[in-house]
């Protein structure tokens, strides 16, 4: 999948003019790229468009205009874009009660070792999480995960007869979600 290039980034003034239309398009796109697994965990599968949007929004929020800083952010965010034969997602742990954030994250320590993409009964592809977002006593509520799919798993993923599920099998959190046909079609087009 193509990475975001510096040429695709628009200046803050121009971005303000196109932001509403761009944002609506991304919201529509993400409808088919968002998967809730249980009541606390959401995965949003990334691609070049979703990452471009995140970059533009971050530059807007931080008022970044310096070309070297923009270049740096593009390089950092491009790491979210899946490589060949991969899917990548942002995993969000939703905790709405402020008092429960720390205890809940401690309870879910190790969740980054418990996520897999299951394709039919043949493949259980473990999620590969970005390093540095969890330690033995700390867990970030936002995680970045990749699912490297061997060719056979990619073919099975595209076969509508096979169920595709995101699964979490953690001692404190067990849940699965079947990917909808729309989600699978959106993701399969990028494999």
Task: Enumerate the language-model features and the residues they cover.
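Long, contiguous binding/interaction regions
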Residues: 1-86, 95-191
